[in-house]
């Protein structure tokens, strides 16, 4: 539940990311015992901000685990990491959304630059998501308790909790530009 609330809360704070619709927990499902559903993007033209914030959301489940569990992280975030790496590589290599314009080449120098750009992008997204998670620790705990009890947590329910207890923090956080 904590892992999924990490995704949900970071997704709700990010103004360029598709909005979260619900979080579901179903421990009897063998492949995916919990998942967070987001709306589809409104169009096919995604900006660097959209994709950067998606990186943040992908990494936030793992960050929530690290923050709340007194153990090392689990293997539950492997799919999120694979997807984050693929997305960061696409952002740099195909979409030209890295810090530098990279021209295709087979040289080792070119590969080094790509690795550095991808690593930097993931590191920056990780730091930004970690900032959000640490600021919303109480909300994540509260939301995970609702999810464990109800098995489904809708965006409306989470927003109700935010409005009742965390409105000022949410409004301040929603004004931050995460993608630099």
Locate predicted features.
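Soluble catalytic regions of large protease machineries
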Residues: 1-180
């Amino acid at each position: 539940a904590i892992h999924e609330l990490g995704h949900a809360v970071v997704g709700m704070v990010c103004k360029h990311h598709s909005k979260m619709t619900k979080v579901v927990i179903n421990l009897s499902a063998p492949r995916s015992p919990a998942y967070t559903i987001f709306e589809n993007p409104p169009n096919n033209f995604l900006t660097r901000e959209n994709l950067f914030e998606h990186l943040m959301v992908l990494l936030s489940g793992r960050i929530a685990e690290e923050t709340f569990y007194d153990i090392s992280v689990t293997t539950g975030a492997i799919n999120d990491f694979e997807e984050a790496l693929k997305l960061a590589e696409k952002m740099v290599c195909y979409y030209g959304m890295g810090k530098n314009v990279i021209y295709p080449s087979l040289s080792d120098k070119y590969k080094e630059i790509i690795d550095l750009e991808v690593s930097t992008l993931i590191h920056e997204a990780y730091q930004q998501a970690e900032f959000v998670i640490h600021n919303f620790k109480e909300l994540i705990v509260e939301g995970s308790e609702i999810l464990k009890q109800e098995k489904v947590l809708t965006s409306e329910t989470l927003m109700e909790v935010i409005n009742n207890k965390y409105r000022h923090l949410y409004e301040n956080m929603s004004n931050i530009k995460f993608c630099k």
